[in-house]
């Protein structure tokens, strides 16, 4: 926020003039009530003791100097025990329009990352069936987080971890094999555990099509054929579903490759050498209790099978070997108990605890006609992501997934999302952009187009409280991006966009732009609206949502 940075710089200069130290815990934030100004600072409260004077007396000295040295500050008041409330003159806010015009699509970008290498792993659904709506929420969060981190100065790579090894893959192959037997009319007992969806039957039919002698092959060979084709087919569908959802990954990493390249054994050797892995009862254990876990964990079972944890440690070892400074995993909330042991593993690999973070994504409650839609991959009773995107569109689905904190459950109302009304959040924001574009088009048709670069004289008429409110919000976009990037929380962007859209719609209702009292006010307001449209576009792009020019 330019205003926040300006006030901090001004206060530092004043504090230096008073020959006082700059304290650590200075708060400069917009007050809850706008009547108290644009920003409130607690500088006098935290400096009172070093200055050896009452906070209000110190605040008086600070405010006097602020008013003397900074003409862009139009008002300073002391509140309560010594808070300093600052109000900026309109021309200070007018400069925000210039900044948007100069930066364009980069307005709001910050360099908090400073080139640090970040890897974000998301979706990583088992290739045992189509993506469901819960996967869609994780996909939207991961893809948007990657966009935002790049915008915030991080060198960002995205990855999908393909769980193509282990028991689930064996079960998938067996499910297809069972269905193939059914198709051929064999009287076979239904397995106690298998994947039941229609997609399994479709895959079995395709396997029989190119391998008509499947059931004549040795069972082990037939199962291998079924498993490989099923994994390849399902992964192709997953890739397509994500592409249709405007989600991409830079790397698709195979779990199987960890075993085939010896990466798992290499990680085991590293843990043994550091005394963190040990043999007991024929199994290999990891001392996760050394890092705060509630018990030690098995890496390799006594029957020789690897645990998921073993592969995950080797996988993260591989991530750090590729030079990432921060690894972010996006998991379903049902994996919350897995977080402490993975943190332990990262520290055991010799990496800082803060080099690894997990975003937990809560469930999506999909509603249709007021009733919740059941989702179970094995039972085949789930609403696929592809179905939802086809019904409501990628834009609406993405925005809804990003409209709440990731760790909060989300009610996804299919009927609401399809409505072209102000009750629909994505429509509300997109329509704000389309509404501005419509005003700009109509103004151009009448022969009035805002200047490419607005000068101070042109913007002088912008003094109404509604206009200043929008300028404040535009100025705050950079702060929002920084907060979202540092907290790994993309919902900050969707919240901000809804607030900015609300200000725009309110302004539009109260001030019919094309009916402005005179040409000067019209041109100033057109410049303001064009800046707001740019910020809406930038924010929507971070969410992977389009900014239509007409709706």
Swiss-Prot record:
It is found in: Cytoplasm. Transmembrane segments: none annotated. InterPro entries: aa-tRNA-synth_I_CS, Arg-tRNA-ligase, Arg-tRNA-synth_N, Arg-tRNA-synth_N_sf, ArgRS_core, DALR_anticod-bd, Rossmann-like_a/b/a_fold, tRNAsynth_Ia_anticodon-bd. The keyword Lyase does not apply. Coiled coil: none annotated. A motif ('HIGH' region) lies at residues 125-135. Signal peptide: none annotated. Its EC number is 6.1.1.19. Keywords: Aminoacyl-tRNA synthetase, ATP-binding, Cytoplasm, Ligase, Nucleotide-binding, Protein biosynthesis. One of its GO terms (molecular function) is arginine-tRNA ligase activity. Its main location: cytoplasm. HAMAP family: Arg_tRNA_synth (MF_00123). NCBIfam families: argS. Monomer. This is Arginine--tRNA ligase. The gene is argS.
């Amino acid at each position: 926020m330019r205003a926040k940075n300006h006030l901090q710089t001004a206060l530092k200069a004043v504090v230096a003039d008073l020959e006082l130290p700059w304290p650590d815990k200075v708060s400069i934030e917009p007050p809850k009530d706008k009547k108290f100004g644009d920003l409130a600072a607690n500088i006098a409260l935290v400096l009172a003791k070093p200055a050896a004077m009452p906070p209000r007396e110190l605040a008086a000295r600070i405010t006097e100097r602020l008013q003397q040295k900074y003409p862009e500050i139009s008002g300073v008041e002391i509140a309560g025990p010594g808070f300093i409330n600052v109000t900026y003159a309109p021309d200070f806010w007018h400069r925000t329009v210039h900044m948007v015009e100069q930066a364009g699509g980069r307005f709001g970008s910050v360099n908090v990352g400073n080139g640090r290498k970040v890897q974000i792993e998301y979706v990583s659904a088992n290739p045992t069936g189509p993506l469901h709506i819960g996967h869609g929420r994780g996909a939207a969060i991961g893809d948007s987080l990657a966009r935002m981190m790049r915008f915030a100065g991080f060198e960002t790579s995205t990855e999908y971890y393909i769980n193509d090894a282990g028991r689930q893959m064996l079960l998938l192959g067996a499910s297809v094999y069972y269905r193939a037997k059914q198709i051929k009319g064999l009287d076979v007992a239904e397995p106690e555990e298998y994947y039941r969806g229609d997609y399994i039957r479709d895959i079995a039919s395709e396997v029989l099509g190119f391998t008509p002698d499947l059931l004549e092959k040795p069972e082990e060979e037939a199962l291998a054929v079924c498993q490989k084709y099923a994994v390849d087919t399902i992964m192709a569908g997953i890739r397509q579903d994500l592409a249709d959802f405007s989600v991409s990954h830079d790397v698709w990493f195979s779990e199987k490759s960890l075993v085939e390249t010896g990466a798992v054994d290499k990680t085991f050797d590293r843990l043994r050498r550091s005394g963190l892995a040990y043999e007991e009862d024929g199994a290999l254990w990891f001392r996760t209790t050394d890092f705060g876990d509630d018990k030690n964990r098995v890496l390799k079972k006594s029957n020789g099978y690897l645990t998921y944890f073993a592969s995950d440690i080797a996988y993260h070892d591989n991530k750090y070997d590729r030079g990432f400074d921060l690894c972010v995993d996006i998991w379903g909330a049902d994996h919350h108990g897995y977080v402490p042991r993975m943190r332990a593993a990262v520290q055991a690999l010799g990496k800082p605890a803060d080099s690894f973070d997990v975003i937990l994504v809560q469930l999506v409650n999909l509603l249709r006609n007021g009733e919740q839609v059941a989702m179970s991959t094995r039972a085949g009773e789930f609403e696929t992501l592809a179905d939802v995107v086809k019904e409501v569109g990628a834009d609406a689905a993405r925005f809804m997934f990003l409209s709440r904190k990731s760790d909060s459950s989300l009610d996804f109302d299919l009927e609401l999302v399809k409505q072209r009304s102000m009750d629909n959040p994505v429509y509300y924001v997109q329509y704000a952009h389309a509404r501005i574009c419509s005003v700009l088009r109509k103004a151009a048709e009448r022969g009035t187009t805002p200047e490419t670069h607005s000068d101070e004289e042109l913007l002088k008429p912008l003094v109404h409280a509604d206009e200043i409110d929008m300028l404040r919000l535009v100025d705050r976009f950079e702060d929002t991006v920084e907060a979202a990037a540092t907290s790994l929380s993309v919902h900050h962007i969707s919240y901000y966009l809804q607030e900015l859209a609300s200000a725009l719609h309110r302004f539009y209702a109260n001030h019919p732009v094309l009916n402005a009292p005179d040409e000067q006010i019209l041109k100033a307001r057109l410049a303001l609206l064009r800046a707001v449209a740019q910020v809406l576009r930038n924010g929507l792009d971070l969410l992977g949502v389009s900014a239509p020019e007409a709706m």
